[in-house]
């Protein structure tokens, strides 16, 4: 691996040590670093504009939120994603800034494993026509919004009604997202490599309605 896309938490202020390290790696190890159009203004000149067919890997600098945003770029460019934790919560990150040089050496020597993660495809329809489509690495949430009342939920699997209840909302979570919002709402933890998802009702009116794994 020689060509790396760089994705940053735009609110992170202590960028100078990171850019100095990347410049050193660029110069001493002949590595090429590229920025993405939405973050172009954040980077010095040696980090060039992205070339789609050039990327080998994307490096995400930040916490879990930054990693989740970068995951969409990983999907778009069809390359692996590695997280470098700069935030308070780095559950999804494999490396830290102090380990970055060693981690990149391992990538160059092909001393790594790519772990496949499940994605959710979410489609919102109105009058049976799609009005919104997106992919999610962690979860999709149906929520009552600003309304003070419960909403009626009917959940189907393979066109069969599984549960009907009144609640504040519903979380549909991948194994990756099972340790986040779903867990805080009483859902179980799934192994990251499982081919399954969790449906977690938010404050259901009936106590017998519990989180379900599919």
What do the PLM-derived regions correspond to, one by one?
Residues 60-64, 71-73:
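N-terminal glycine-rich "phosphate-gripper" loop used for MgATP/nucleotide binding
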Residues 59, 82-84:
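Hydrophobic/aromatic beta-strand patches that form the interior of the parallel beta-sheet core
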Residues 164-168, 172-208:
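Gly/Ser/Thr-rich active-site loops/lids in small-molecule metabolic enzymes
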Residues 6, 60, 172:
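Redox-cofactor binding/interface segments in oxidoreductases and associated redox assembly factors
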Residues 89-168:
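Catalytic core of DAGKc-family lipid kinases
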Residues 32, 78-80:
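Proline-centered loop/turn at the N-terminus of a beta-strand
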Residues 15, 66-70, 179-184:
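Short glycine/serine/threonine-rich phosphate/pyrophosphate-binding segments
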Residues 1-57, 97-113, 123-134:
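ATP/NTP phosphate-donor binding region
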């Amino acid at each position: 691996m020689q060509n790396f896309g760089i994705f940053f938490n735009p609110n992170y202020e202590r960028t100078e040590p990171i850019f100095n390290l990347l410049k050193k790696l660029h110069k001493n190890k002949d590595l090429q670093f590229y920025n993405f159009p939405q973050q172009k203004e954040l980077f010095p000149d040696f980090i060039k504009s992205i070339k789609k067919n050039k990327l080998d890997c994307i490096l995400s600098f930040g916490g879990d939120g930054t990693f989740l945003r970068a995951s969409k770029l990983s999907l778009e460019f069809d390359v692996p994603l590695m997280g470098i934790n700069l935030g308070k919560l780095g559950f999804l990150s494999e490396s830290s800034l102090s380990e970055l040089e060693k981690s990149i050496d391992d990538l160059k020597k092909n001393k790594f494993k790519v772990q496949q993660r499940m994605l959710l495809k979410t489609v919102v329809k109105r009058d049976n026509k799609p009005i919104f489509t997106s992919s999610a690495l962690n979860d999709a949430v149906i929520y009552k919004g600003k309304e003070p009342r419960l909403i009626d939920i009917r959940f189907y699997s393979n066109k069969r009604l599984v549960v009907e209840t009144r609640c504040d909302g519903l979380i549909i979570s991948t194994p990756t997202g099972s340790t986040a919002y779903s867990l805080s709402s009483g859902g179980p933890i799934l192994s990251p490599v499982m081919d399954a998802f969790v449906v977690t009702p938010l404050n259901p009116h009936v106590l017998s309605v519990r989180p379900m794994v599919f």
